[in-house]
């Protein structure tokens, strides 16, 4: 019997069994929502802090008053360069991104020229501090083949039960639950932290792919296909294979995804989600709690979740701009967004601008 047929029966049975319970919960939630909704205006007024109190050394959003980032630590892992400081003034320069002192563009171009996959090499570089030899990379790939296999029963017991429909939430709660599958989750020795890190790098694509399949089935009414990772394939190839019902993908797709994985593997250690992870880790908490917190941060629309906001914003603009060729009409609606009169009322145009990069983004 096909693996997807086995899983299909389980998820369908679970969905039918929990339907009536969810209806009752929705009714109870409605009563609570009605109560809290009646108090929301008072709460907004009570917690509002006037702009006049933001002065001195108060840092808003990890930003200095001149727009530069707040120094939160020192790292040898990644470096981001987007401007120079001269006499207290920012001088824009073309953006550059370095992994362990190596310019990322050089790594990407080398793999593109050779037609090879580079994410695994980049992961090794970021973890260990140096580029692996051929033998070291081959051994690391063998370990990754093992790490991609989720614990027995994890997909059925965790991912298929009570799916939320949001992949980032599914990833976060799945990471937390992996604590229960770890024989030594609270050991903070370097040996154990490295083991957990390698396993999580392997687990992530499988968790996301399976959560995506369950989401399409549960909320989209599509047939459920759960595919196991295949040994000998790269992370990019395996992910594409697992999210497609027929396991098909092209070489171009795989190399494009591999390049994206390399480009987003590290970004200087000062972004919101990495900062959250470092703050949690500094308390001595376990790896799974720290990484799950980082994923929660990454989900936010002012961080990684901006991707989803860009899509929503485009849909909103399409609905309100009758002629895409009319630059004045497009500009007028963008002005409404900036003036907080349209879209989500935040005054933000998502996907534009960066806190560090000025002239260009090397990614």
Task: Give residue spans per PLM region.
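Hydrophobic alpha-helical bundle cores within soluble ligand-binding/oligomerization subdomains
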Residues: 2-363
């Amino acid at each position: 019997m096909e693996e997807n047929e086995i899983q299909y029966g389980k998820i369908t049975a679970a969905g039918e069994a929990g339907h009536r319970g969810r209806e009752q919960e929705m009714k109870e939630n409605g009563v609570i929502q009605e109560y809290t909704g009646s108090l929301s205006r008072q709460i907004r007024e009570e917690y509002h802090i006037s702009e006049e109190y933001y002065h001195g050394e108060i840092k808003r959003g990890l930003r200095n008053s001149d727009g530069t980032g707040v120094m939160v630590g020192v790292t040898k892992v990644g470096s981001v360069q987007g401007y120079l400081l001269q006499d207290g003034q920012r001088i824009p320069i073309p953006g550059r991104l370095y992994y362990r002192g190596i310019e990322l563009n050089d790594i990407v171009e080398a793999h593109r020229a050779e037609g090879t996959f580079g994410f695994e090499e980049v992961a090794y570089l970021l973890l260990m501090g140096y580029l692996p030899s051929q033998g070291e990379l081959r051994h690391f790939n063998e370990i990754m083949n093992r790490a991609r296999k989720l614990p027995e029963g994890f997909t059925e017991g965790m991912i298929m039960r009570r799916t939320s429909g949001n992949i980032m939430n599914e990833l976060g709660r799945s990471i937390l639950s992996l604590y229960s599958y770890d024989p030594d989750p609270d050991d903070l020795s370097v040996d154990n932290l490295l083991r957990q890190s390698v396993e999580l790098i392997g687990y992530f694509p499988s968790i996301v792919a399976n959560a995506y399949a369950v989401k399409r089935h549960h909320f989209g009414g599509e047939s459920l296909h759960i595919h196991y990772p295949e040994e000998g394939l790269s992370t990019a190839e395996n992910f594409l294979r697992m999210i497609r019902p027929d396991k098909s993908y092209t070489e171009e797709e795989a190399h494009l995804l591999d390049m994206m994985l390399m480009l987003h593997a590290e970004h200087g250690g000062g972004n919101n989600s990495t900062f959250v992870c470092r703050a949690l880790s500094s308390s001595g908490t376990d790896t799974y709690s720290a990484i799950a917190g980082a994923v929660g941060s990454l989900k936010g629309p002012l961080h990684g979740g901006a991707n989803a906001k860009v899509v929503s914003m485009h849909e909103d603009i399409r609905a309100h701009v009758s002629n895409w060729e009319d630059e004045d009409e497009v500009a007028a609606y963008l002005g409404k967004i900036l003036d907080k009169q349209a879209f989500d009322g935040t005054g933000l145009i998502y996907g534009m601008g960066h806190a560090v990069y000025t002239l260009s983004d090397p990614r």
